[in-house]
Amino acid sequence: MKNKALMLAPLIIFLVLCVFLLKGLFGNPKEIETGRIGHSMPEFNLPDLMQDGKRWTEKDLLGEVYLLNVWGTWCPTCLIELPYLTKLRGQGVKIIGLYYEQGYDSDFGDVFDINALRVEVSGMLAKTGDPYQFNILDLKRTLALDLGVSGAPEHFLVDKNGTIILHHTGDINERVWRAKFAPKLSELN
């Protein structure tokens, strides 16, 4: 009896692994859930990317519906979606940038040059259009981690009370906006 159970153990382990692998293989990577939908924005106190001395907290964002766009200049998909996001801003959508710095890690002795980043961001936004009311700098990725961000771009639709209503991984284009965001935004306004 013991031998039979020992012989079945590898088969059971194999079957469990197959289920997980198949789920990952056939799952939609755009449907990665953050776990924060229906919850408040995490607490944060982070600097403005472009303005020295200015800091933002989750409380500063209460009272208006907004789209939080996690992005970076290093992200080619972010570059592609900026003109469409700029069009949305022109239609009255409040978009706040969360600049996700991928290349910096103080644990490895990296030195961060805010002025160089500001020049890079300004140049990029001058070419593509600037959809942002303002940009929050998340240098150590603390807010991004609290939100469950896995990369960029990612988007969070947040209501007037600071509750996350919708999360989307990947770029926002007209199709995505109409299918996912526009209906939710209509409900909130």
Regions found by a protein language model. Give the residues of each.
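N-terminal targeting signals for export/organelle localization
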Residues: M1-P47, N189
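Short, internal strand/loop/helix patches
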Residues: D113-V158
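Hydrophobic beta-strand anchors of alpha/beta hydrolase catalytic cores
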Residues: L67-L68, I95, H155
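A short beta-strand-turn-helix
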Residues: N45-Y66
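Thiol-/selenol-based redox modules, centered on thioredoxin-like
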Residues: G92, E154-N189
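Short, flexible/disordered intra-domain loops and linkers
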Residues: G103-A116
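Short pre-active-site segment immediately N-terminal to redox-active cysteine/selenocysteine motifs
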Residues: E64-Y66, V70-W74, G151
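Conserved redox-active cysteine motifs that mediate thiol-disulfide chemistry
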Residues: V70-K87
